[in-house]
Amino acid sequence: MIRRKLTKQLEIIKDYLWDMKECVLKIIDDSLIALESKDKNLAKKIINEDEKIIDDYQYDIEDLCGRIIATEHPVATELREILAIIKIISSLERIADHATKIVKVVLLLESDLDDFDFLNLYFKPLREMADTAKEMLSDIFDAYFDGDFTKILKIVKYDNIIDKLFSKQKSIVIDAMKKNPENLDYLLNILFLNSFLERVGDHVATIGELLYFIRIGEKVNLT
């Protein structure tokens, strides 16, 4: 009976975890939509509303995990899973935080985002980095819920794509700074945008490592 109750509570936590992941995916996508379209209302919604939703998910999941540890005394695999989930939701919250930083740049650089170079030279790689991070996050959660942990090992190639894009864009932006020092503030913000998405990729890889550890019980480096 106790074991059945613990299993049911873990399923509830995993349902919350899945929903939190879906919310994070939407925030990443919306942040890029706001950036491309200069949608200040969408940017403000992400900052004022969506970020709170993520915080609420984090609080609720941490609370449920704490209650299970205190009342059900899980051991071995179950305890490992609960402790890993607490770390996973922290990484999800940080991903959402980086997406929020992206939309803050929307409000800061509103007039500069009309620049032809932004859409053609700077935005396309940002979109590619964001889409790659989203695909990574979706794939590792699918692997976790499907029980196919070989898929998690394949996300290394995705993180490599993000790292290469970041490295390339960093070089392009730094070169532009040297040639156009009068645009330093604008270009610094472009560099920050790339940095935010590179960190998103790192956090997704960390989640993959934790999900792999939950089931296999072995540490793996996905970065």
From Swiss-Prot:
GO terms for molecular function: protein homodimerization activity. Pfam families: PhoU (PF01895). InterPro entries: P_transport_PhoU, PhoU-like_sf, PhoU_dom. GO terms for biological process: intracellular phosphate ion homeostasis; negative regulation of phosphate metabolic process; negative regulation of phosphate transmembrane transport; phosphate ion transport. Its main location: cytoplasm. GO terms for cellular component: cytoplasm. It is found in: Cytoplasm. Keywords: Cytoplasm, Phosphate transport, Transport. Plays a role in the regulation of phosphate uptake. Belongs to the PhoU family. Homodimer. This is Phosphate-specific transport system accessory protein PhoU homolog. The gene is phoU.
